[in-house]
Design a protein with these regions (language model features):
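Residues lining hydrophobic/aromatic ligand-binding pockets adjacent to catalytic sites
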Residues: 1-234
Length: 234
């Protein structure tokens, strides 16, 4: 199994002094980050579809063995709620595939008010191009076998999100995994337990994408490093 472990985002001035050097320019944060981690989750794409120049800059500043997980546009997940958005989906996917091998999964994070609608999800999955994707459901009504089976039918990952308000069932729906570890604080034992869970999926997953919450204190990179060290040891 390949482990892709990092944080949600990388460009935080609050990290200067505890992760980034105090005098590091913002423009050099991504290369610095990419020397230490192999992936990051980009929230920028939730607000706007990136320009070609942005895609090229991301590629130029990272090594070949680096992966960008991209949050799908809110126009798809929040405004349209997966309905009647084929043009936006097609355009977004066309743009981001220019990342080539650096493209990781696309995260479709649904709003908490969006309750289960299996027909809508099924229709959307039929329109989704052949690419790695993960769905983060933030309403518990989605957590049942009907939804998990739909994801399995398209080899789409259920995003296993661990938050202070909701914990996603640890259901395996694809041959890769996607974890978002979002609680305010994780102990060393917590990180160890999650690393053990990831290791246990070695027969199911070829790749595991794992993202810690960024946190203003800069604890996210430290937790990501802890998990990397644990998985490299085992």
């Amino acid at each position: 199994m390949n482990f892709w472990i990092g944080t949600s985002g990388f460009q935080y001035s609050e990290w200067k002094g505890n992760f980034y050097p105090e005098d590091l320019p913002t423009a050099k944060m991504l290369p610095f980050y990419a020397e230490r981690f192999t992936t990051t989750e980009i929230n920028y794409t939730f607000h706007r579809i990136p320009a070609q120049k942005t895609i090229e800059n991301w590629k130029a500043q990272t090594p070949e063995k680096f992966r960008f997980a991209l949050k799908a546009p809110q126009k798809i997940t929040h405004w349209a709620k997966l309905r009647d958005c084929s043009d936006t989906l097609e355009y977004f996917c066309k743009v981001v595939t220019d990342l080539d091998d650096r493209l990781g999964p696309v995260l479709f994070q649904l709003p908490p008010t969006f309750k289960k609608d299996a027909d809508v999800l099924s229709s959307f999955l039929r329109e989704l191009p052949s690419m790695r994707a993960a769905f983060e459901f933030r309403n518990e009504s989605w957590f049942d076998d009907e939804i998990f089976d739909l994801l399995k039918s398209r080899n789409v990952a259920l995003c296993i999100a661990d938050t202070d308000t909701i914990a996603t069932p640890r259901s395996i729906t694809a041959d890769y995994g996607y974890l978002r570890l979002r609680r305010e604080d994780y102990t060393a034992d917590d990180v160890k337990r999650w690393s053990e869970f990831v290791r246990e999926q070695s027969t199911s997953w070829s790749d595991a994408f794992i993202y810690f919450k960024h946190e203003e204190s800069g604890i996210g990179p430290k937790l990501a490093r802890q998990m990397i060290d644990l998985l490299e040891e085992s």
